[in-house]
C-alpha cells in the first residue's frame, strides 16, 4: 500500500463532497467522539444538533477536530482530519442570516437533521429538541490517500547467475570448449 499526503486544494475538494464525519471534542483530559452530518462552505463546516453532551463540551472548549473518510478497501481509502474552532449560531436576530445560510446548505441533503431530531431518552428523561446550528472554522487540515502498490510484471529475463551445469554459462562454454555433456 502507498500512502500519499493530499494537497490543501485536494483536501478541500474532497471535503466538499463528504457529508458524514466524526467530531472529536474534549472536556478536561477526556475526549469524546460522535458522528455528525456536515456541509463544507467557504472555510467552515456547518452542522445541526440539539442540546447534548457534544454541544455542552464544545461550548466549554471550542477547539475541535472532525475526521471524515471514504473507504474502498483496506488498501484504498482517503482520510481527512480538520482542526478548527466551534462557533454556535444562536437563535437571535443578528444571527438569522448565518442560521438561514446553515439551513440552506444543510437542507440539500435528505438526512441533514438526523440524528439530532431523533427522540432521545437519557436517564429516563426525554431530551428537549431545541435546534442548534453551528459552524466549525477550519484552521488547518491534513489529508491522506492510500492506494494499492502497483504490481510489477513478472521478470522474464534470463538470470545472470549460473545455476550449475545446465545454466547459461555452461551452455555457452560447451560449444566453445568442444565438450559435450554425456
Question: Which residues does each predicted region cover?
Answer:
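Extreme N-terminal tail/first-helix region
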Residues: 1-17, 155, 161
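Beta-strand-connecting loop/turn residues
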Residues: 43-44, 62, 139
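Secondary-structure transition/turn motif
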Residues: 49-53, 147-149
Amino acid at each position: 500500500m502507498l500512502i500519499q499526503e493530499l494537497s490543501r486544494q485536494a483536501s478541500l475538494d474532497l471535503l466538499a463532497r463528504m457529508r458524514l464525519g466524526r467530531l472529536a471534542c474534549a472536556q478536561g483530559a477526556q475526549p469524546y467522539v460522535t458522528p455528525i452530518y456536515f456541509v463544507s462552505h467557504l472555510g467552515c463546516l456547518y452542522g445541526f444538533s440539539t442540546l447534548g453532551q457534544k454541544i455542552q463540551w464544545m461550548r466549554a472548549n471550542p477547539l475541535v477536530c472532525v475526521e471524515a473518510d471514504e473507504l474502498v478497501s483496506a488498501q484504498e481509502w482517503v482520510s481527512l482530519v480538520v482542526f478548527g474552532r466551534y462557533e454556535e449560531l444562536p437563535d437571535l436576530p443578528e444571527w438569522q442570516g448565518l442560521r438561514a445560510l446553515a439551513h440552506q446548505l444543510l437542507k440539500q441533503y435528505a438526512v441533514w437533521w438526523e440524528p439530532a431530531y431523533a427522540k432521545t431518552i437519557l436517564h429516563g428523561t426525554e431530551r428537549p429538541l431545541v435546534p442548534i446550528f453551528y459552524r466549525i472554522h477550519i484552521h488547518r487540515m491534513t489529508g491522506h490517500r492510500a492506494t494499492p502498490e502497483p504490481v510489477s510484471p513478472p521478470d522474464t529475463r534470463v538470470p545472470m547467475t549460473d545455476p550449475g551445469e545446465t545454466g547459461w554459462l555452461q551452455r555457452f562454454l560447451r560449444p566453445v570448449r568442444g565438450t559435450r555433456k554425456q
